[in-house]
Amino acid sequence: MVKQLRSQRWIRLLLFIGITLAVASDASAQDYVRDSEPKLFSYDELVQLSLDQPLSPELTEKLRVITTTPFINNEAYYAGSRPRSLNVKDLGPTLRVAFWNIERGLELDDIQLFLTDKDRFMTKVEAERKEAKEKGRSVRDVALEKIPQEIELLQAADVWILNEVDWGVKRTQYREVVRELANTLHMNWAYGVEFLEIDSKQLGTDTFDDKENEQERQQLIEQFSVDKDRVRALHGNAVLSRYPIRDARLIPFKVGYDWFKETKITPLEKAKRKAALLVGEDLLQETRRGGRTALFVDLDVPEVSGQRLTVVATHLENRAKPKVRRQQMEQLLSEIRDVHNPIVVAGDLNTTGSNGTPTSVPNMLYKRYGSTDFWTTQGVQWATGVGIAYSATRGALKLAGIQTRIDPTSANIPGLSANLERGLFSTVEKFRFADGKAFDFRGVPEQTVNGKSGTLADSNQRLGRGFAPTFITEFIWKKLRVAKFKLDWIFVKSELNSPRDKKGSYLFAPHFARTMTDLNNFTPEPISDHSPMTVDLPFHDPSDRGKTSK
């Protein structure tokens, strides 16, 4: 009898504990924001933002809110989506993180296709490459055998960090790019607005009165007309995750480039400043409200220290000198100094060594407005007809020293081998968190996909000389066809106290960094002007590092 009573008590106790845990779990789940976003602008408000006149207090406040308030969506979590089990040989259970500057999302359809139907994507693009070659168009050389594996690597990533993500912009068919991609991946997402794209051509308000030919003027008006009910004009960064999002913050940088005031300078004043002669500075005005930001997202990841992972998506200023980008990075670091859990920082840091990203005229126009066919024909003629003037000779000379700038971590030797980006990397390497931890700067051959070593090789793929370039662009000059840069970076804070300590902990440390150039360049027109990257972060310290396999 006594034993029976004790047994019943234990059963009741276990039931009570089970119910308590279930309730606690449900309560925790209820804490996740299901779908939240700041108020968006109407078309008339966007037009007001584009005018060079003081804003009303209400519009000023609305602009402040949308550039400091992240969108948060955990619908995937509530629909039952959970992280996929990834077990990497000799690493064990692992989190794979992907980063990609997706160039507005101009080729979102191709991204969605390779994520959902690899074979159909391969067949489609092989046919497109064949057709392009038959028409005499050049396509980039790729290793076809690597592409299926690169697709599978991206498919297995449970966290995606994105730059240049459009929302309601005509060039990307007014699509909510982050929402569509998150639906494809069955991921939760956070989105931070950097800019309101309020150039007169983006809003369809340009009347092109400078054109003498009325037929041509009407053609341009039609080309740049917009759907006033669909345009939202947002552009920013995003974090997508199969882990639920606990919280997110959006912090604008205090220093940078004023994309609104600077574009209001007249063409004559710009000519006096010789801005049009600087290769790498955009050749058409790009009027925007807002500025560069850092998006901080806290994910609930039970497998890591503190059961929390902080992910930071950022895009440092291209229209600024390297010292300004370093200052932006310093501000970002100050925001995470007191974070004790693991951190991943990723973004296009624009480490060109100058105040601009080199590009060709057609690519710049396509990136700005979309519609490849238009910009490869009359669009370029129109653009050059309204004052795009620059010196090809000077440009070629200026680019001669930077066409393969693929190791901005190298020493800065003024007069011999200048590298003005070195200061940014020194800042990150010297930085210490409040708990004494540091970012992982190691480059151990056994932890890389190709056996290469050197600074940051574990988290950013290196080649024989420098890093694998993440940005490749063609130019119009015969003697300088291609420029290659390492602009995109991943930094990881795990359990390491010294950035280069090879004997330190490898728990959640970066392994097997990859830059997927072949996949990105497989399509006749590259999917983006930047290639995607991945890094593997093991949930346990690998037991036998010396035998780590690729």
Regions found by a protein language model. Give the residues of each.
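N-terminal, active-site-proximal structural segment of metallo-dependent hydrolase catalytic domains
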Residues: 3-6, 12, 27-234, 253, ...
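Bacterial N-terminal signal peptides
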Residues: 12-22
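Metal-dependent phosphoester-hydrolase catalytic domains
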Residues: 30-84, 245-250, 299, 322-323, ...
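Short coil/turn segments at beta-strand junctions that form active-site/ligand-binding loops
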Residues: 94, 156, 307-308, 340-342
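Active-site flanking residues adjacent to catalytic metal/cofactor-binding acidic residues
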Residues: 100, 163, 314, 346-349
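Active-site environment of divalent metal-dependent phosphoester hydrolases
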Residues: 105-106, 167-170, 197-200, 258, ...
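Alpha-helix-centered segments that form part of catalytic cores
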Residues: 141-144, 152-160, 230-234, 277-296, ...
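Catalytic-adjacent loop/helix segments of enzymes that bind and process anionic phosphate/sulfate esters
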Residues: 224, 231-235, 242-327
